[in-house]
Structure formats: C-alpha cells, structure tokens
C-alpha cells in the first residue's frame, strides 16, 4: 500500500468535505507505509478520536475502491513520522489503544494517553490499531544565555491599541499587555466562514486549561482572527481580572528578546513570558527565518504547555505552509486545534455592515448594506472602511444613507471594482485558449481535457477577482467551494512542476490583465 494511494484518497475526500472540516481534521494527518501496513499519525488524541469516529469508514471505503478491493492493515497513532513509538500489535476487528511502555515522565503536551477500544462497525474492514506516541524533543528549562546577536533583527511596532493593563516582572525587563476592549465575542459577527473558529475561541475562553491548546487560527488579512484573539483575552480578564493575559504581535516578541539580550536580561525575559496564564501572539509567520527567535519561542512554547498555560496563535497561512519556520515548531502548532477563517459570504458581509452601523448609531437601510456587501467582497477591513466613508459623506452632506449617496461616496472604489476582470471574461478567455466550449467548463465532465482548463479558470478567478470561493463555485456550474479550493491548490502545484501548465497560466494571465 503506497503513500501515493493514500494521498489520492485524501484528495477525493477534500472534494467531499467543507474546507474547514478538511483542514481541521484530515489535513494534519501524516502517513507512512511499511510493508502491507499503513500508519496514520494524528497530532493529538482529540484529532485521532474524531477521525476514528467520523472519517475512518469513508477513508477505508476510498482505499478499497482505489486499491481494487485490497485493503491494508491500518494503524492510527498519536505523534508524527519523526516522533513516534514502535507500532502497536494489530488487533482483529477493533481499534485498540495500547498501554504505553514505562518511560520517564515526559512534558505534559506529549504525555501518552489511553482510551477505551473503539470498535470498527464493519466486519469486512481491515484491522486498525491506535497507539500513543511520545515526542523526542524535551523542554530544556535551563537554556544558557548567548551573546547578543551579531546582526540586529527587525522589530515591528506593537499594535496601535489602547493599553489596558501593565504587567511588570522582576528585573530590568518590563512589558505592557495590549488588549483592545472593543473586540469581544458579543460584537463578533458569526457566519459560515468563521463559525468553527468562533466556537473554538469561545471554548478556550470559557474553559481555560480544558480547551484546545494551542489554538491556531489562520486566514487572509482582515477576516477576524485578531478580533477573536482579543475576545478570548477580554473574556479571560472578565472572569479573572488578576489573570496574566499577554497579547502581542510576533515582531514585538522579537524586539523584546533583542532588548533583553542587549541588557543582559535574558533570564528576566524568559521568566516573564513563561509566567503568563495566556500568551496570544499575532502573525506568527513573521518568525520565519529568524532562527534565534524561533529557538527562544520553541522553549517558551514548551514551557507554557508543560505548565498548562494557554497559547493562541494566528497566521496568514496554514502552519505547514509557512516557509522558513522550523519543522519542530510546525509540528507543535498541530498539538491543539488548527482552524481556518474564510472570507465572509454575502449574508455575513451584510450582517457585519448592519452591526457596525448599529454600533455607530447610524441608520443603514438593508438595501444599502446589501449594495455595499455585493461590491466589497475581499475582507472585513475593507468592508468597514467603505462603510466609514459612506457615514462620513452622509454626515458632511447632511443626507440620509441611500444607494445614490453610496455611489457618490464610493465612486472611485466602485470604478476600480468595475475594472476588475469578471469571471465571465475569464471563462470565455480560457475556453478560447484551450479550444473548448464555455458550457464544458460549467459541465460535470471530468475528462482531463476539460477538468484541467476548468481548474485553471477557477484559479484565475480566485487570483483576479474579489469573489469568494463559494461565489466562484456557483459561477462554475454550482460547484462546492471546496472544489474551487482544491483546484487553486492543484494549479499552484502544477505551476511549480509542469512547464506546460506554467506557460499556459502565464499566457492567460497576460491576456486577461493587458
């Protein structure tokens, strides 16, 4: 049984599941083959149990179909390909968690756990076993201080928000904890695009030390990741005003570390960051290629999880896709729960506008909100910016908000939107280029001569328009947004490995943008 066959089945499952479900439960799985056995590694017990209960049956069906009826012995384990215990003995007809061998007590985040056997309901399914796995990367609490960096690392400014509370530590190092009081769960507008992320954040905020740890939120700019992070912090302080909750941008962590090295106060730096109750770090991708910062954060992360302290991280991309980030950090980020925050769909955009207008005590007609939401699709930040312009124009002109006033106040923005490439134009151009009919792109045909141009057209639509994935899917014959996401990723891979696809995409891009 080859890993390639497993990947084929995962790709098929990607098309069947909503992107949030796939990215949360299936994407973190790692796999390797040894003889006739296929080993699948989950990052933690929670993911393993969920996959076992919800997706194992379908995965085995796909393996059987693709493997021409020959099913492998499948083992589900906790850990990763680089960090695992020897495989458990295979037990017929049921999954079984083998008791761990006697070992020295490991750090809490990677402590072996056991569970009651889970019976596979179908007699014809192959034996499946689960076993815990122990990390081989122990926390090193007494990491020696090193000399200051030869070359100074860039240090970004902290978020421009009102300081809520100061936290001081013994010694020279002092730090301010930033939380924006206006970012709460109560004023966060929930929709299909952020439903799972909001639920996970609330679980952490309301059940500290019993929620997901770490919680990793990822997605494009202006989609609400930072809002949710602040909402967690504000809720924790509401429940316990004495809690040490620290929010900061990743570059602030770098700046504090450099300053501590310069002041010969690295021990105070460590003591401060490792004594918080909850550490909230925004834009973790800025740690990329900062080796010393990654080293220090690695030990800080381990210390916090060992002490049962909460860590919440955000990034603009899936952790495995952050280039220049050490694999050991990527692996640890998967210990808890990783959730995508998608661009808001039309209904959510309208709800956001109505909520913002209510907060500003402005009367916004529903048709006016709908008009703005239809034309501003990229992210919440741009949506709010457009609404502020409309409100200001209404105030200065002394006129109520109408569609006519919106056209006046946003005329430059709307003119820019009108110049954007349309999906119809992309479909027409791609069909002409590949000498097929537009109706073929919208059809259910799956032959390569049609499927590949369709994927190219979807990828171009994602790159050149502001339409959301669901909207692009509807434009291509009512397809699901997960199909669009799969097409975009597939074309991105082929542009790296296939010269013909790379040239086709380049030519089409030039045609559509000139």
From Swiss-Prot:
<dbReference type="InterPro" id="IPR020591">
    <property type="entry name" value="Chromosome_initiator_DnaA-like"/>
</dbReference>
<dbReference type="GO" id="GO:0003688">
    <property type="term" value="F:DNA replication origin binding"/>
</dbReference>
<comment type="function">
    <text>Plays an essential role in the initiation and regulation of chromosomal replication. ATP-DnaA binds to the origin of replication (oriC) to initiate formation of the DNA replication initiation complex once per cell cycle. Binds the DnaA box (a 9 base pair repeat at the origin) and separates the double-stranded (ds)DNA. Forms a right-handed helical filament on oriC DNA; dsDNA binds to the exterior of the filament while single-stranded (ss)DNA is stabiized in the filament's interior.</text>
</comment>
<dbReference type="GO" id="GO:0006260">
    <property type="term" value="P:DNA replication"/>
</dbReference>
<feature type="region of interest" description="Domain III, AAA+ region">
    <location>
        <begin position="178"/>
        <end position="394"/>
    </location>
</feature>
<dbReference type="Pfam" id="PF08299">
    <property type="entry name" value="Bac_DnaA_C"/>
</dbReference>
<dbReference type="GO" id="GO:0005524">
    <property type="term" value="F:ATP binding"/>
</dbReference>
<keyword id="KW-0067">ATP-binding</keyword>
<keyword id="KW-0547">Nucleotide-binding</keyword>
<feature type="binding site">
    <location>
        <position position="226"/>
    </location>
    <ligand>
        <name>ATP</name>
    </ligand>
</feature>
<keyword id="KW-0235">DNA replication</keyword>
<dbReference type="InterPro" id="IPR018312">
    <property type="entry name" value="Chromosome_initiator_DnaA_CS"/>
</dbReference>
<dbReference type="GO" id="GO:0006270">
    <property type="term" value="P:DNA replication initiation"/>
</dbReference>
<keyword id="KW-0963">Cytoplasm</keyword>
<dbReference type="InterPro" id="IPR038454">
    <property type="entry name" value="DnaA_N_sf"/>
</dbReference>
<dbReference type="GO" id="GO:0006275">
    <property type="term" value="P:regulation of DNA replication"/>
</dbReference>
<dbReference type="GO" id="GO:0005886">
    <property type="term" value="C:plasma membrane"/>
</dbReference>
<dbReference type="InterPro" id="IPR027417">
    <property type="entry name" value="P-loop_NTPase"/>
</dbReference>
<feature type="binding site">
    <location>
        <position position="225"/>
    </location>
    <ligand>
        <name>ATP</name>
    </ligand>
</feature>
<keyword id="KW-0446">Lipid-binding</keyword>
<dbReference type="GO" id="GO:0016887">
    <property type="term" value="F:ATP hydrolysis activity"/>
</dbReference>
<dbReference type="GO" id="GO:0005737">
    <property type="term" value="C:cytoplasm"/>
</dbReference>
<dbReference type="Pfam" id="PF11638">
    <property type="entry name" value="DnaA_N"/>
</dbReference>
<comment type="function">
    <text>Non-cooperatively binds DnaA boxes in the plasmid RK2 replication origin (oriV). In vitro in the presence of plasmid RK2-derived TrfA and E.coli protein HU, forms an open complex at oriV. This complex was not however competent for formation of a pre-priming complex with E.coli DnaB and DnaC. Broad host range plasmid RK2 requires not only DnaA for replication but also TrfA and host factors.</text>
</comment>
<keyword id="KW-0238">DNA-binding</keyword>
<dbReference type="InterPro" id="IPR003593">
    <property type="entry name" value="AAA+_ATPase"/>
</dbReference>
<dbReference type="InterPro" id="IPR010921">
    <property type="entry name" value="Trp_repressor/repl_initiator"/>
</dbReference>
<dbReference type="InterPro" id="IPR013159">
    <property type="entry name" value="DnaA_C"/>
</dbReference>
<feature type="region of interest" description="Domain IV, binds dsDNA">
    <location>
        <begin position="395"/>
        <end position="514"/>
    </location>
</feature>
<dbReference type="Pfam" id="PF00308">
    <property type="entry name" value="Bac_DnaA"/>
</dbReference>
<comment type="similarity">
    <text>Belongs to the DnaA family.</text>
</comment>
<feature type="region of interest" description="Domain I, interacts with DnaA modulators">
    <location>
        <begin position="1"/>
        <end position="90"/>
    </location>
</feature>
<feature type="region of interest" description="Domain II">
    <location>
        <begin position="91"/>
        <end position="177"/>
    </location>
</feature>
<dbReference type="GO" id="GO:0008289">
    <property type="term" value="F:lipid binding"/>
</dbReference>
<dbReference type="InterPro" id="IPR001957">
    <property type="entry name" value="Chromosome_initiator_DnaA"/>
</dbReference>
<feature type="binding site">
    <location>
        <position position="222"/>
    </location>
    <ligand>
        <name>ATP</name>
    </ligand>
</feature>
<comment type="subunit">
    <text>Oligomerizes as a right-handed, spiral filament on DNA at oriC.</text>
</comment>
<feature type="binding site">
    <location>
        <position position="224"/>
    </location>
    <ligand>
        <name>ATP</name>
    </ligand>
</feature>
<dbReference type="InterPro" id="IPR013317">
    <property type="entry name" value="DnaA_dom"/>
</dbReference>
<dbReference type="InterPro" id="IPR024633">
    <property type="entry name" value="DnaA_N_dom"/>
</dbReference>
<protein>
    <recommendedName>
        <fullName>Chromosomal replication initiator protein DnaA</fullName>
    </recommendedName>
</protein>
């Amino acid at each position: 049984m080859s890993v390639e066959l497993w990947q084929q089945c995962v790709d098929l499952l990607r098309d069947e599941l909503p992107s949030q479900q796939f990215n949360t439960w299936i994407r973190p799985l790692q796999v390797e083959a040894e003889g006739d056995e296929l080993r699948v590694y989950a990052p933690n017990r929670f993911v393993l149990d969920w996959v076992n209960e919800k997706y194992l049956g379908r995965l085995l069906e796909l393996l059987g179909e693709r493997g021409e009826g020959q099913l492998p012995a499948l083992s589900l384990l906790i850990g990763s390909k680089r960090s695992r215990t020897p495989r458990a003995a295979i037990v017929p007809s049921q999954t079984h968690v083998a008791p761990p061998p006697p070992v020295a007590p490991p750090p809490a985040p990677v402590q072996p756990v056991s569970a009651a056997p889970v019976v596979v309901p179908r007699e014809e399914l192959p034996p499946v076993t689960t076993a815990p796995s122990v990390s081989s990367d122990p926390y090193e609490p007494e990491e020696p201080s090193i000399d200051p960096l030869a070359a100074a690392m860039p240090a970004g400014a902290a978020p421009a928000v009102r300081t809520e509370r100061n936290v001081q530590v013994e010694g020279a190092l002092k730090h301010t904890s930033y939380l924006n009081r206006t970012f709460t769960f109560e004023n966060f507008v929930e929709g299909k695009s952020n439903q799972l992320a909001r639920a996970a954040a609330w679980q952490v905020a309301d059940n500290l030390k019993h929620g997901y740890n770490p919680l990793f939120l990822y997605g494009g700019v202006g989609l609400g990741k930072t809002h949710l992070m602040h909402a967690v912090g504000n809720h924790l302080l509401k429940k316990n005003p004495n809690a040490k909750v620290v929010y900061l941008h990743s570059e602030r962590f770098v700046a504090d570390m450099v300053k501590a090295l310069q002041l010969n106060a690295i021990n105070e730096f460590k003591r401060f960051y490792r004594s918080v109750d909850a550490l909230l770090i925004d834009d973790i991708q800025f740690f990329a290629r900062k080796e010393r910062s990654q080293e220090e954060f690695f030990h800080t992360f381990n210390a916090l999880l060992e002490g049962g302290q909460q860590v919440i991280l955000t990034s603009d991309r899936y952790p495995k896709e952050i280039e220049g980030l050490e694999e050991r950090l990527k692996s640890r980020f998967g210990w808890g729960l990783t959730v995508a925050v998608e661009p808001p769909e039309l209904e959510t955009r309208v709800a956001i506008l109505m909520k913002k207008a209510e907060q500003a005590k402005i009367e916004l007609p529903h048709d006016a909100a709908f008009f703005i939401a239809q034309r501003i699709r990229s992210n919440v930040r741009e949506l709010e910016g457009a609404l502020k312009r409309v409100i200001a124009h209404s105030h200065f002109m002394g006129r109520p908000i109408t569609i006519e006033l919106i056209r006046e106040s946003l005329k430059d923005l709307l003119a820019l939107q009108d110049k954007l490439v349309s999906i119809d134009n992309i479909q027409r151009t791609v069909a002409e280029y590949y000498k097929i009919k537009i109706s073929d792109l919208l059809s259910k045909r799956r032959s390569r001569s049609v499927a590949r141009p369709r994927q190219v057209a979807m990828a171009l639509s994602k790159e050149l328009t502001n339409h959301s994935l669901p909207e692009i899917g509807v434009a291509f014959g009512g397809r699901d947004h997960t199909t669009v996401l799969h097409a975009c990723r597939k074309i991105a891979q082929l542009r790296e490995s296939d010269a013909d696809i790379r040239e086709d995409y380049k030519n089409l891009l030039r045609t559509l943008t000139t």
